[in-house]
């Protein structure tokens, strides 16, 4: 049956029984949903006209940030069997880099697209301007940062036991609601209830900052293996990255993405915290229209 006008979406119209592209198609970071166009071809009821292939935006993305180890420290390390298992079944970015030393400016870059001029682990900070949580909220999405050891929802304390605020960049933006800042105990057991984008921040004992690689790897396996397994069958993604390496000039780190619609393999394209943020925004459908904006990852997804 010829496609009707109602089934030709986005920048496409029905002409002579075919969906055809009109001059200025909408494109959203390579991720396809109803109303979009890819490779100059039109979507029909959410699929490419004449093509069974499709793309899907994930319902949730969970970003876990570990600490202070280079890619060389982790790759093939017998003390990190779980991380290396994730790398084997997911997308491993072999040229992934942090943007600064010490920790805090890296977290700010990943969350807000800027180090905000911060060159230390200062606390407290009061910052303004755009950030991922604010952009998500404006677009109708949701976000949360789940920090292990945080005493209470929204607590602005700089440190408490093995919790460190310097690893929770959202706290530094007072325009965000306190509910963005959650203890890890609030991480949903019903994974379908996860926010659009969330961050998991292990404490200093479990993020490899103070504890060993083996301790951090074991924590990841115990705490996040159920979610990572669930994600692969439920349109969800887990991103594992590090804030920085061991303070070398190269600052090369491990970044792995696993989950639904992730094309397993090794990717040697350049990736840093800024480009990872651009990818998180694209995954959430936010776009990245600023002049000179970095392009998100587009080749690590299946159709």
Description of each model-found segment:
Residues 51-303:
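Flexible, surface-exposed loop/gating regions in the mature catalytic domains
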Residues 1-48:
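Extracellular/cell-surface secretome signature
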